């Protein structure tokens, strides 16, 4: 595991340890909403209980910022899970190596066939996902999937296990554009309780993944905390700060945030407290106001109604026609979690147009 020279993790953990949600007042919230550019303390105020009565005002400001930087466009993409083998024992995940599920890895022929099916829906952006197993989904295998995807899609993202800089560079050379890594929780103590075995137990290596990806030449990186593992507002604060500091250090990078909540999975649950839609909305609005130019993805974990309401207000990216199992044309392996929005691409497109939004199938040209 590569170690890089970076102080971002120490800075994020220091600020997060001092984040006291109860110290903020309604005056702090209104002051933040009246600022052109927000600082870290303003972010904290928008994630505090004091901001709860101001969700409508936050929504107005968020929508203004979204319109300013993104217009009425919403980017569509879909994930493809190519393998669900995993070497980690994470208590909240269906891919947990000890979970008794049907494991599978797509062959080159399967990948080609499934990508062709996805491309036929009109989508030109794809996100390739694997379980975290270097043995069963090695860097070479991922690279082969990326090369195949390059024949069908104009933008290719990766949501795989953290890699070293040279491995990210290899995948960039294969045709990958951006990398998504969820830190899950930014509380190191809780992190160790949820991640019991495997390479994912190394908190720092995962934390530094976005920096290594950018050093490897990726044009964009995405951040996310799995809301519900820890204190959702504290994790959201840390996640936003993480993205903010990476943006300052790498000003050329395209930054985006994902907002995943815990979902049920095959053979298990987590026993952790849930995160309400109201809390999720507050976090999404705070992200948009704090980093108005960052992308924001709302996944199929959420209901169609919630997703339809949040796009245009603060979310700028939405998945469509989602399958979280292994195999599109023929199911070969079990899902990582349950989804809530099962609409296909055409249904999502029509829903966006009904709202006066512009569905965007491609916002990137490869040269």
Predicted regions and their residues:
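Glycine-rich, proline-tolerant flexible connector loops at the mouths of alpha/beta enzymes
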Residues: 47, 78-80, 127-139, 264, ...
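Core AdoMet radical
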Residues: 97-112, 118-213, 219-223, 229, ...
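Conserved, mostly hydrophobic/aromatic
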Residues: 35, 62, 90, 128, ...
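Catalytic cores of alpha/beta
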Residues: 164-173, 230-244, 303-313
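Short, charged low-complexity linear segments at domain edges
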Residues: 54-75
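Generic structural signal for well-ordered alpha-helices
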Residues: 78, 115, 142-146, 168, ...
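Auxiliary Fe-S-binding modules of radical SAM enzymes
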Residues: 1-51, 248-367
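Canonical Radical SAM [4Fe-4S] cluster-binding loop centered on the CxxxCxxC motif
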Residues: 68-110
């Amino acid at each position: 595991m590569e170690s890089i020279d970076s102080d971002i993790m120490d800075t994020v953990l220091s600020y997060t340890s001092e984040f006291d949600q109860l110290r903020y007042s309604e005056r702090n919230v209104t002051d933040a909403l009246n600022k052109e550019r927000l600082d870290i303390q303003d972010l904290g105020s928008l994630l505090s209980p004091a901001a709860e009565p101001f969700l409508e005002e936050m929504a107005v400001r968020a929508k203004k910022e979204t319109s300013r930087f993104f217009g009425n466009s919403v980017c569509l993409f879909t994930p493809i899970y190519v393998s669900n083998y995993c070497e980690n024992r994470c208590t909240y995940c269906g891919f947990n190596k000890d979970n008794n599920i049907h494991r599978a890895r797509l062959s080159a022929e399967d990948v080609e066939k499934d990508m062709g099916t996805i491309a036929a829906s009109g989508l030109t952006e794809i996100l390739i996902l694997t379980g975290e197993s270097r043995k069963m989904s090695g860097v070479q295998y991922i690279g082969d999937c990326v090369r195949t995807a390059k024949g069908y899609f104009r933008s290719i993202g990766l949501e795989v296990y953290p890699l070293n800089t040279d491995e990210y560079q290899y995948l960039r050379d294969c045709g990958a554009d951006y990398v998504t890594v969820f830190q899950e929780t930014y509380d190191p103590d809780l992190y160790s309780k949820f991640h019991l075995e495997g390479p994912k137990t190394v908190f720092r290596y995962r934390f530094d993944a976005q920096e290594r990806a950018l050093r490897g030449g990726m044009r964009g990186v995405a951040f996310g905390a799995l809301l519900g593992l820890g204190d959702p507002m504290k994790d959201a604060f840390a996640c936003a700060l993480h993205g903010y500091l990476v943006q300052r250090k790498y000003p050329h990078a395209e930054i985006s945030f994902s907002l995943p909540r815990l979902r049920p999975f095959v053979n298990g649950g987590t026993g952790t407290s849930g995160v309400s839609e109201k809390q999720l909305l507050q976090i999404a609005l705070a992200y948009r106001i704090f980093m108005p130019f960052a992308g924001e993805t709302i996944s199929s974990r959420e209901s169609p109604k919630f997703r339809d309401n949040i796009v245009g207000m603060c979310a700028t990216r939405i998945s469509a026609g989602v399958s979280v199992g292994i195999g599109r044309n023929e199911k070969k392996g079990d899902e990582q979690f349950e989804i809530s929005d099962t609409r296909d691409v055409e249904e999502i497109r029509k829903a966006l147009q009904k709202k006066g939004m512009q569905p965007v199938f491609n916002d990137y040209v490869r040269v």
